[in-house]
Amino acid sequence: MIEVFPFGIVLGLIPITLAGLFVTAYLQYRRGDQLDL
């Protein structure tokens, strides 16, 4: 039997992690743009 609770936690963390990485990369990109100007 599949452990539903940990599986749900993992499925919930994956999009949050991806979103966090995307936001961090975007902020660093914006910050780099401002420094170049």
Swiss-Prot record:
Location of the protein in the cell: Plastid, Chloroplast thylakoid membrane
Top-rank taxon, per record: Eukaryota
InterPro entries to which the protein is assigned, alphabetical: Cyt_6/f_cplx_su5, Cyt_6/f_cplx_su5_sf
Membrane topology: Single-pass membrane protein
Gene Ontology BP term (one): photosynthesis
Assigned protein family: Belongs to the PetG family.
Protein name: Cytochrome b6-f complex subunit 5
Organism: Amborella trichopoda
Record gene name: petG
